[in-house]
Amino acid sequence: MDFETSPTTGGATTSSRPTDTALSTRGIRVSYGHVQALRGADFDCRAGEVTALIGDNGAGKSTLVKVLSGALAPDDGEVFVGGEPFHAHQPTDAQAAGIETVWQDLALAPDMGPVANMFLGRETRRKGLLGALGFLDDKSMAAAAQREFAQLGVTADPRRRSVSDMSGGQRQGVAVARAVSWARTVVLLDEPTAALGVVQTKGVLDMVKRVADRGLAVVLISHNMSDVLAVADRIEVLRLGQRVASYTRAEASLEQLVSTMTGGTATPESDSTNSAGGTQ
């Protein structure tokens, strides 16, 4: 991996700036009062790859997603997007940097249809009289939604009037399609298969692979180790707010991941990373 040296915040003098990744974190720290939620969760995610973040409850996964999505500013450390420092104060800052998030609750408007949800707040308009007073271009938005659904394998009908009567897998598909249609660099997926059945889960995992195949970096947060091993190119293990190990899919087994998550083992890679100050 290529690195540059650059100034950091929080009193540190230098940090490693990754130059060959879509998304990276260095020295991220977040505290809630006396509780340290993150204390050095360093990881890298490359374009066209799925990077899974796993860990037991309290490992810091949710807090890290909030930092990456712009919903929470870290107390210290840096986030890099395309090798450049990224400072977000709100989710729209992350969206401006090409980062889109699919939250576990999907954040869909239940009384609106798939197309309206995909373009909510970003509606396409036709020019009105003298270039003003434009009208919503429903036809072009519906066509764009249909193309996105077809490319990702989403089975939902974009003509439906409401997403509330769709299956869980279909709603998940709408949320993923919305994120992919606007993302330029990274898609964050927070527990995308939670509460889904076997068939729906397979459909969502197939979508995750297609998103990465389009050249986007995908960060997958999941408790389901089978899902992680099915789609992840790299697996980062968090424990007590730190990245403690990193595996490729070929290196990892279910038993090894569970043992590392719970403190049973450490890998030579994680040991060398820690001794170099990467996750302290």
Regions inferred by a protein language model and the residue ranges of each:
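Glycine-rich phosphate-binding loops of nucleotide-dependent enzymes
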Residues: 2-280
